[in-house]
Amino acid sequence: MEPKEGGSPQATTLKRNKDKTMAKTFKKILKPGEKKKKQKAIVIAAIKQLIHYLETNCIELEGICRISGNNTKVKELKKQLENGEGDSIDFSKIDSHCVSGALKAFLRDGDEPLLTFDLYKNFLASIDIKDKNSKISFIKSLLSALPKENYDLLQILLKFLNTIQLHSSINKMTSSNLAIVFSPTLLRPKEESLESMMTDSNSISEVVRVLIEEFHVLYEIKQTLLYQVSAIDLGIREDKRSTSEQLEDAKVTIEQLKKHLNEEARERSILETYCTSMEQKLQELEDINKSLTEEKDSLGELLNEFKETNKNQANDINSLKNDIKDVTEKQTKTELERDELNKVKVKLEKDIETTRIELKSTNDECQKLKVNNNKLGEDIKNQMKEFEQTRKSLLENHKLEFEKHQLEIQQFRQENEQLKKEKTDADLQLERVQAEISILLSSSNDKNSKKNSLKNQKKDLDNALKKCKDQESKINQLEKEKSKLQDELTKLQKSSSSSSSSSSSSSSSQASHKFVFGKKPSSSKITTTTTTTTSPAQQPTTPPPPLDEDDIISVKKFAFYYMNLAIKTDAMTKGLPCNINSSEILEELLSKNIKVQQWSEVISKKLKENK
């Protein structure tokens, strides 16, 4: 037996080597778990330290946690905190936006978000609950299902975010803005895709917003205590409590340590069983190595194929990254377009208000214009009535004057007939005188006896000759007066025909003297009254005064402007344009000698042409 036991030094060395290899493998197995725990503790301490600084110094900073700091400085700060150099860092010398950026980086770069991958769908399902109380109770149950570290750290973070949104009037960070910033870091799926990012982004931000706003209800903390206790009192600052409280905490920690020791004992038993199984597996592995060497050659081809597939997958990943960049750029563009549209909307609302005010003013002006037009129409109607009255009175005056002229003409005719009779009588007397002279000449022999009778007869002859001369002069005067009266009759007939034809235009000029341009309205009245009043008062010996052309032109101008005003007012009431150069039209009418009856047609044609 001894040679078997003592003759196995190689076996002892093999056992020692096996023990060493097993210890190394155990160390390799245990080290990753310990490293993860240490890293978790460092990350939690760093997050608490960052929250403490931001909560005490940067609550009222505008754009806190939204504005991103310098990327290189954020990475340097994160490395220092990961290396455990948090106590030596002076945060006052660092940009506060870089501090908030480091906080977001720690939350984003973790292996698993605080709300965990397993509860992702459950948190999204809470959005479909419409009742607020039932929604909060459901979310509270989900929070209780979280690991304790996640639960405590989430409490510190949500308290910090709640205090930020309470100062949103200063820092411009509402609960919705904070939810947009922190939703991708707190809640995300295990396998992200473009579709999930597009569809679930709004619902994720809504869940985080509810967590921020309902922090007091979810963690059952009174609002008064919230302002008395800061986030660091939950795990960073030194205890300033009584010994009894510290003892209670110590008891809790002892219980936790006991639980930890029990877990370690359980792990040791597991490792011992694992060692026995590993010894058995080592022999199996030696056999497997032989088979693996044989299969190695066959796996070369598979590796090449796998590399190609990896390349394709890398290309797909790059294309997906590019797509994500495009989507983010599109989102930024859409946000900018929304801002621009809102600005345009505000401008349009202002323009609409101004247009409404202008429309009101225009409506008021239109009403005023309607009132003025009504007044003008009434004035025009009154003027037309006055014009008709004056026209009737003028026509009556013309008729009376015409009748007077006819009576005078009849008187002149009667006087002319009397003068003709006197002339014939004078001719007869001349013949008689000549006969008497011939008789006297025949009886010239009886001079002496008849001297006295001859003298008397000579006197009679002289008287008769004087009478004949007087009668001839009277006859000549009467003939001249007759010719003048005939001329006056022709002129009066012409004037009466023109007055009757231009009764619609010239008589209106005599009715409304306010609208005469160039001459006073009284001049036309004076000329017409002088022609009518002087004719019956004149003696038959003096001729009537001739008509003045200036007066006729002034009457025509007055008639034109009155007609033009009436036609323009009709066009204004109908809403038609009435921009006409009246002076040019008047010159055309006067130069072409167009009748007054046709003036209204010419003016209306000009109005239609200017449309």
Curated annotation (Swiss-Prot):
Sites marked Arginine finger:
R66
Q: Which GO terms describe its biological process?
A: signal transduction
- Output one GO MF annotation: GTPase activator activity
Region ranges (Disordered) = 476-550
Q: Which residues form the Rho-GAP domain?
A: 24-219
Compositional bias, Low complexity, is annotated for 495-509, 527-540
Highest taxon above the source species: Eukaryota
Listed transmembrane segments: none
Q: Does the keyword Transcription regulation apply?
A: no
Listed Basic and acidic residues bias regions: 476-491
Q: What is its main location?
A: cytoplasm
Q: Which GO terms describe its cellular component?
A: cytoplasm
Its function, per the record, reads:
Rho GTPase-activating protein involved in the signal transduction pathway.
Which protein are we looking at? Answer: Rho GTPase-activating protein gacN
Q: Which gene encodes it?
A: gacN
